[in-house]
Amino acid sequence: SAMLNNVGYAKAVEDILGVSIPDRAIFMRVILGELARIIDHEVCLGAMFVDMGALTNYWYLYNPREKIYNFLSRLTGARFTNSFARIGGMAHDFYDGWQSELLGYLKEVEKGIDDTLTLVEKNRIFLDRVQNICKISAEDALSYGFTGPNLRASGVDYDLRKDKPYYYYDSFDFNIPVGSCGDIHDRMFVRFYEMKES
């Protein structure tokens, strides 16, 4: 989440100081934030699949993720601990050819998601390991301070991008996946569907 943390810090300082940023910087932050969301979800899901002994699914998610890390490295100079947002904007603009390169990577990400879902959506062994296991109710999730996909997996329809929109998120058409019973299955599938929305 380095990119999201970097953007969150810059936005907080900008809000405190009353600094506005150019639209170009806003859209760069949205794009990079959504990429960070995809990478984070792939890490969570990939680690879960490794723990379950499902290495094929791990590679379907991790191989495209590596290409996004390479994109971030080329753009920011670092794969993981990138710091690219600056108070008042960004360090620099995207490089030439970034758009077609990134669209190619995103097609691979989507294929990895689809291939993984094909393997697990109706797989009885997988479903036995994740459905109705470690249920967390909406009330408990709120009481424990859950946020993000774990909160939404417990049935709480709350996402800052929709509920307190910033950076023009109110002008984007996207859905917020929400779970129904808060089990491992819901926590995993909320992440799958959020990646597709990103």
Regions found by a protein language model. Give the residues of each.
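Active-site bordering "gate/hinge" segments
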Residues: 1-198
